From Swiss-Prot:
Part of the 50S ribosomal subunit. Forms a cluster with proteins L3 and L19. In the 70S ribosome, L14 and L19 interact and together make contacts with the 16S rRNA in bridges B5 and B8. The keyword rRNA-binding applies. One of its GO terms (cellular component) is cytosolic large ribosomal subunit. The keyword Glycoprotein does not apply. Keywords: Ribonucleoprotein, Ribosomal protein, RNA-binding, rRNA-binding. GO terms for molecular function: large ribosomal subunit rRNA binding; structural constituent of ribosome. One of its GO terms (biological process) is translation. CDD domains: Ribosomal_uL14. The gene is rplN. This is Large ribosomal subunit protein uL14. It comes from Clavibacter michiganensis subsp. michiganensis (strain NCPPB 382). It comes from the Bacteria. Belongs to the universal ribosomal protein uL14 family. Binds to 23S rRNA. Forms part of two intersubunit bridges in the 70S ribosome.
Length: 122
């Protein structure tokens, strides 16, 4: 359950380490975001020489949440951390590698490039 001011770790190699959520996309009054949802965020921590800089406003898709997500078969999935992958203007990942597992819900939301780069899809 990601909302405004939520901080997320970054699960790719763009150079950002942490982002802070500015807005959840998908409706004017939308409050929460879950797996596969797109957010607008600002980079709070980044490594020197990376593709993104601290203070940059980016779009990102959520790939892991601590809050459990219910699946259509009745099972639940949750992760140890909240994490996201930074997107470019076309909705594709800006990085070339994804670290850690990602939720299967990304396949339903048509983020196939992230699914193919991820080491594990749960």
């Amino acid at each position: 359950m990601i909302q405004q001011e939520s901080r997320l770790k970054i699960a790719d190699n763009t150079g950002a380490k942490e982002i802070l959520t500015i807005r959840v996309l998908g409706g004017s009054g939308r409050r929460y975001a879950g797996l596969g949802d797109v957010i607008v965020a600002t980079v709070k921590d980044a490594i020197p020489g990376g593709n993104v800089k601290k203070g940059e406003v980016v779009k990102a898709v959520i790939v892991r949440t601590k809050k459990e997500t219910r699946r259509p078969d009745g099972s639940y999935i949750k992760f140890d951390e909240n994490a996201a992958v930074i997107l470019n203007s076309n909705g594709e990942p800006r990085g070339t590698r994804i670290f850690g597992p990602v939720g299967r819900e990304l396949r339903d939301k048509k983020f196939m490039k992230i699914i193919s780069l991820a080491p594990e899809v749960i």
